[in-house]
């Protein structure tokens, strides 16, 4: 599976939006695959929840939404290498108090560089989702402008991208 992901990372260089989402059920091997890519490309993985969370702790809660984008931009600029950014644990981006649209945020980053991100949701019927309907952080998106890379069977095989 790492070979297919490596090829995809090389192939998306010429696309307008260079966003690849690793999608699969919990414990399917998404993070392990991202770590493999990190080791092969010598690019660190940005743990968004830990890194951004630590930065936001220094900002008063009433002002965090004003600083989240700038802090995240600084973190991604520090972490990206050779036009490649690897992201994991992005759940914090869905925090409603930050007033972010996580997918649009990722797509904006993917115009300037290739972004490979573990998606903490699912894709079904051509729709990308995070959370369950009725949950306060539930999000539902179309898949235009991104490349889904589905992982199933505990990471042992991948399903063709939609």
Per-region residue spans from a language model:
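Short glycine-rich substrate-engagement loop in P-loop NTPases that contacts/grips substrate
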Residues: 51-76
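Conserved glycine(s) of the Walker
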Residues: 29
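N-terminal pre-Walker A segment at the start of P-loop NTPase domains
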Residues: 1-13
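P-loop (Walker A) phosphate-binding loop of NTP-binding proteins
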Residues: 25-26
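Hydrophobic anchor at the beta1->P-loop junction of P-loop NTPases
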Residues: 22
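Conserved P-loop NTPase "ATPase switch" module shared by AAA+ and STAND
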Residues: 80-98
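Hydrophobic positions on the alpha1 helix immediately C-terminal to the Walker A/P-loop
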Residues: 33, 37
């Amino acid at each position: 599976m790492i070979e297919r992901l490596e090829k995809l990372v090389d192939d998306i260089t010429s696309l307008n939006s260079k966003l690849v989402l690793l999608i699969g059920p919990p414990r399917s091997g998404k993070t392990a695959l991202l770590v493999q890519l990190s080791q092969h490309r010598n690019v660190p993985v940005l743990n968004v929840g830990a890194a951004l969370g630590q930065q936001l702790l220094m900002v008063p809660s009433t002002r965090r939404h004003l600083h989240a984008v700038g802090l995240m931009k600084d973190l991604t600029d520090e972490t990206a290498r050779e036009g490649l950014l690897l992201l994991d644990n992005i759940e914090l981006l869905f925090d409603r108090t930050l007033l972010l649209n996580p997918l649009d945020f990722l797509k904006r980053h993917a115009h300037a560089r290739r972004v490979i991100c573990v998606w903490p949701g699912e894709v079904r019927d051509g729709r990308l989702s995070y959370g369950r309907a009725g949950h306060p952080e539930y999000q539902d998106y179309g898949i235009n402008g991104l490349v889904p890379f589905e992982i199933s069977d505990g990471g042992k095989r991948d399903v063709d991208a939609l």
